Amino acid sequence: MAKAKFERIKPHVNVGTIGHVDHGKTTLTAAISHVLAKTYGGEAKDFSQIDNAPEERERGITINTSHIEYDTPSRHYAHVDCPGHADYVKNMITGAAQMDGAILVVASTDGPMPQTREHILLSRQVGVPYIIVFMNKCDMVDDEELLELVEMEVRELLSEYDFPGDDLPVIQGSALKALEGQPEWEAKIIELANALDSYIPEPQRDIDKPFLLPIEDVFSISGRGTVVTGRVERGIVKVGDEVEIVGVRTTTKTTCTGVEMFRKLLDEGRAGENCGVLLRGTKRDDVERGQVLAKPGSINPHTTFESEVYVLSKEEGGRHTPFFKGYRPQFYFRTTDVTGTIELPEGVEMVMPGDNIKMVVTLICPIAMDEGLRFAIREGGRTVGAGVVAKIIA
């Protein structure tokens, strides 16, 4: 079957459902798909299609995720839904499904539950920028005051994790009733879609961000100088641009004197392209794999950071035994491994395969990093964990 052509006319936004088990995340996903298809056109996916999530592998980690798409008049959305709690943890930490915003589903019959809190914390740690709340199962609660109480509780919980709990949209609805086609509840799904459109800003495209290229290889071309190669992660580099070489050693400045792709000379290299960048006056030994080429001042080297980490289970090819404080694995950032030590949270003695944990990492040499950068934890070339930089310390 031929693939449908992807029409990029409208802005594209990535969202997903998060929240406690059985609060109705998948039912809501199906309801959004149905109501928006019915209202604005498009293909509706039913509950069983979404619930039967295919298994994916991201950096060797098994994750079950459902991807659906839907449209509002002004935007195209890609929406992820996961069947199990562990899938959410892995998904958010590996960045397998980056979210520009999340829909937090809370059953009004239960109020916030342990995984509600954990998903909010994870969203904070991995940098999900916006959360919208959908209070589900409101058809089962007759008491208006009870609904207000649950809403207050959810807002307070979000504020506790530095989300704007008082200001973010909370929609009270019933995913099941909307799916059954009851107009008053379908209207709530449209209200949710409007909130997605108005509350989540249009994400900045990679090409509009400051230039960054992780260096994979360094060559010396006689008579021309030093060329670094890699895939441009974000932004654009033009011939004549001043750039910085960041990470591992002291940051140095140089100028891009040429860009080439497949042996052809170009004026610029753009996000997503594999290219070689010729650097003025830079010696072959001044640059190495693991450094990045970046727009001056846009990124700094750091060694110590707080991270959220998922430790692979034995079945995923991870460790068979726990690790303890003083553990010294390799941390793989972009193109290179760096040794580092870990500090576990107070009261945590050991970490078991399959756990997710907050830890402070100190690397033996600095790496160019921003909050939100993903990394792998490796032992002898084998991946044993995945993590994300939550907060830079030094």
UniProtKB/Swiss-Prot annotation:
The record's annotation in Gene3D superfamilies points to: P-loop containing nucleotide triphosphate hydrolases, Translation factors
Can you tell me which residues bind Mg(2+)?
T26
Q: Where is this region: G2?
A: 60-64
| GO terms for cellular component | cytosol
Q: Which CDD domains does its entry note?
A: EF_Tu (cd01884), EFTU_II (cd03697), EFTU_III (cd03707)
Q: What does this protein do?
A: GTP hydrolase that promotes the GTP-dependent binding of aminoacyl-tRNA to the A-site of ribosomes during protein biosynthesis.
Tell me the protein's name: Elongation factor Tu 2
Gene symbol here is tuf2
